[in-house]
Amino acid sequence: MAQKVEAGGGAGGASWDDGVHDGVRKVHVGQGQDGVSSINVVYAKDSQDVEGGEHGKKTLLGFETFEVDADDYIVAVQVTYDNVFGQDSDIITSITFNTFKGKTSPPYGLETQKKFVLKDKNGGKLVGFHGRAGEALYALGAYFATTTTPVTPAKKLSAIGGDEGTAWDDGAYDGVKKVYVGQGQDGISAVKFEYNKGAENIVGGEHGKPTLLGFEEFEIDYPSEYITAVEGTYDKIFGSDGLIITMLRFKTNKQTSAPFGLEAGTAFELKEEGHKIVGFHGKASELLHQFGVHVMPLTN
């Protein structure tokens, strides 16, 4: 059920309403001499792109476009408005978009003193716009829907190591419970992880090829304990075309694991300040070639 947030701005022009969609893909903001001349929004509806249509008047200054990533959504729109010469009503002078993942657009138009913010008190996602338009964009309002995505999205940090092997990705979970590292003669032959998602234990697949040396385990006292960083090394070894991960060491908010594998080659660290590690990805063949993580902000 979408919530309608009333339009702010002036009373000029005629009212328009794009209605409610699944989300916003792109916003084209028409530039005017004194502010925003028009708006045209591309929405997502049943995985199709739907154009809302142009509201306002196109000028020779053209459009500026704000694109929303597929795994992101708009949570707030900061709007300024003012009375400009030649208009009998306030017009929208600038629009700035804020997304869930922390992306902020530049202000489109010219920022002025009077302002309002379109947002949902429950942090919902923007799924439609409405307002008033004519010779310019006079007023802007929005629809917000409660979102089913978790309150904090996970972020994928790039994997480090060699380019050989097949890519694998366990995705992101609520947390990590257990780490299994397969020992190889010259480094790490395989990895496997046990995750937690909504009080359910999920064991990810085996990535790489286990050897007779078996797996070593590192257990995390989830949920009070969580992984904050992974240190490791990678190197070129005899008989292998590319780089392989030779050692991994896991750091939590309470302890540091023993090094798994053989510390040799170039050192690396995977971490993001103020985040915990909630998933892993990489590349593997008969050995582990590349290793990366998914992180999520720490919540109090």
Swiss-Prot record:
Gene Ontology CC, one term: nucleus
Modification N-acetylalanine, positions: A2
Keyword terms: Acetylation, Lectin, Repeat
Signal sequence range: none
Any Pfam family matching the protein: Jacalin
Keyword Acetylation belongs to the record: yes
Gene Ontology biological process terms in this record: response to zinc ion
UniProt region (Disordered), positions on chain: 1-20
Highest taxon in the source lineage: Eukaryota
One GO molecular-function entry: carbohydrate binding
Annotated InterPro entries: Jacalin-like_lectin_dom, Jacalin-like_lectin_dom_plant, Jacalin-like_lectin_dom_sf
Domain Jacalin-type lectin stretches: 2-146, 154-297
PANTHER family per the UniProt record, alphabetical: JACALIN-RELATED LECTIN 3, JACALIN-RELATED LECTIN 32-RELATED
Oligomer status and interactors: Component of the PYK10 complex, at least composed of PYK10/BGLU23, BGLU21, BGLU22, JAL22, JAL23, PBP1/JAL30, PBP2/JAL31, JAL32, JAL33, JAL34, JAL35, GLL22 and GLL23.
Role of this protein: Sugar-binding protein showing significant affinity for (Glc alpha(1-4)Glc)(3) maltohexaose, (Glc alpha(1-6)Glc)(3) isomaltohexaose, Gal alpha(1-4)Gal beta(1-4)Glc, GalNAc alpha(1-3)(Fuc alpha(1-2)) and Gal beta(1-3)(Fuc alpha(1-4))GlcNAc beta(1-3)Gal beta(1-4)Glc.
Family: Belongs to the jacalin lectin family.
Name of the protein: Jacalin-related lectin 33
Organism, as annotated: Arabidopsis thaliana
Gene field: JAL33
